[in-house]
């Protein structure tokens, strides 16, 4: 079977209004893909920024996958959460990116969005640290079928650095250029 090694890190979150952030991530792929080694989901520590508009995570990724088909190519999903002084957390950004289909080093910027408040009370609650609306199903992140019904706001960006190693794809007639 062909193999993909994903080695890298979720570097940081930039341009978020909230000062204390952490990131949940997961790697989604099709049915033909199997995890050989590593973790396909995780969570970073809480990172704070005072003067910059950047929260550094340096969350390592080390995932080894095998596949019999290129269908269902992996995608990296990120959810950024804010934390207040009462240790309450709420989502401030959702986003995803497909893992590049070329080997080598890649620096990716994942644009994120959040669910827009749908009233005055929810706007006030979000502004003064009570939290915003959350998605009940994360498949709405990458499925456009139901996502178009949501009212959303642009959020910050998550910077990811990936080193990709591909093995045995040439044996299956797949060439990467």
From Swiss-Prot:
Subunit description: Probable component of the tectonic-like complex (also named MKS complex), composed of B9d1, B9d2, Cc2d2a, Mks1 and tctn.
Name of protein: B9 domain-containing protein 2
Sorted UniProt keywords: Cell projection, Cilium biogenesis/degradation, Cytoplasm, Cytoskeleton
Subcellular localization(s) per the UniProt record: Cytoplasm, Cytoskeleton, Cilium basal body
Phenotype when the gene is knocked out: Simultaneous knockout of B9d2 and tctn is viable and does not show sensory behavioral defects. Males produce motile sperm and show only slightly reduced fertility. Sperm flagella show weakly ultrastructural defects including broken and disorganised structure. Length of the transition zone is decreased and recruitment of the tectonic-like complex compromised.
Gene: B9d2
InterPro entries: C2_B9-type_dom
Tissue: Expressed in chordotonal neurons in the antennae (at protein level). Expressed in spermatids (at protein level).
Family to which the UniProt record says this protein belongs: Belongs to the B9D family.
Residue span, C2 B9-type domain: 2-118
Source organism of the structure: Drosophila melanogaster
GO cellular component: a single term: cytoplasm
Listed GO biological process terms: ciliary transition zone assembly; cilium assembly; sperm axoneme assembly
Principal location class: cytoplasm
